[in-house]
UniProtKB/Swiss-Prot annotation:
NCBIfam families xrefs: PRK05114.1
Top-level taxon: Bacteria
Organism annotation: Haemophilus influenzae (strain PittGG)
InterPro entries named among the record's database cross-references: UPF0181
A Pfam family matched in the record: UPF0181
Family: Belongs to the UPF0181 family.
Protein name per Swiss-Prot or TrEMBL: UPF0181 protein CGSHiGG_01050
HAMAP family linked to this entry: UPF0181
Length: 52
């Protein structure tokens, strides 16, 4: 596992996504897992993008 540095705005968005999932009946732990996995995928894909 690795650390992802998020801006405050990105952190807020992640919290909102977790809250939305919980509002749909998903447990907090599962919601956190879902959002964390999505963030890792985004971060991994960003790392693969060639730098200009």
């Amino acid at each position: 596992m690795f650390d992802i540095n998020l801006t405050h705005e990105q952190q807020q968005k992640a919290v909102e996504q977790i809250q939305e999932l919980m509002a749909k009946g998903i447990s907090s732990g599962e919601a956190i897992q879902i959002v964390a996995k999505a963030l890792r995928e985004i971060h991994k894909n960003d790392k693969k993008t060639p730098e200009n």
